[in-house]
């Protein structure tokens, strides 16, 4: 799980660096790996058929991420963005873009959303942005209770 496990297995920390062009690249790959572990696709695909179920799942995964990697969400960008800011920002944007696309897909697939919930001014993409912003805010506040977000979803979409 960390350097302690590397030492136990008698792996030279320096040898790990040989696989990457820079420390920033190593940290970036590690951050991506952690994000992927936290938000890995669940066994139950029903999670992505319903916005409320998806939001609950996302907040559960955020709580899991906090338990497994304390401080990761609030500090992850600092380490890999210092040395190579452009690459770090690009990496973070790719991860976030993937999450946003997933939210859009769920919003498009949820058959319980009332007709007319979306229009030209209030699109699926804009609501996905709102949900994502609420998620990022929850991450920074370490607040993994989705109740308020679920109520917003219920009142807005159903």
What residue ranges belong to the model's regions?
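Amphipathic alpha-helical segments that line or abut small-molecule/effector binding pockets
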Residues: 52-67, 147-150, 154
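Amphipathic alpha-helical interface segments
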Residues: 15, 61, 65, 130-138
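Short, small-residue-biased leader/transition segments that mark boundaries at the very start
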Residues: 2-7
């Amino acid at each position: 799980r960390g350097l302690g496990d590397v030492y136990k297995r008698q792996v030279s920390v320096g040898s790990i660096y040989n696989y990457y062009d820079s420390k920033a690249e190593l940290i970036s790959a590690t951050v991506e790996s952690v994000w992927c572990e936290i938000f890995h696709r669940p066994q139950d695909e029903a999670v992505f058929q319903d916005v409320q179920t998806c939001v609950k799942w996302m907040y559960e995964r955020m709580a899991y991420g906090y338990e497994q990697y304390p401080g990761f969400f609030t500090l992850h960008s600092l380490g890999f963005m210092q040395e190579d800011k452009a690459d770090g920002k690009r990496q973070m944007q790719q991860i976030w873009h993937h999450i946003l696309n997933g939210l859009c897909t769920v919003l498009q697939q949820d058959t319980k959303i009332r007709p007319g919930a979306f229009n030209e001014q209030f699109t699926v993409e804009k609501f996905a942005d709102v949900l994502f912003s609420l998620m990022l805010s929850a991450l920074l506040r370490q607040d993994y209770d989705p109740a308020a977000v679920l109520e917003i979803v219920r009142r807005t979409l159903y």
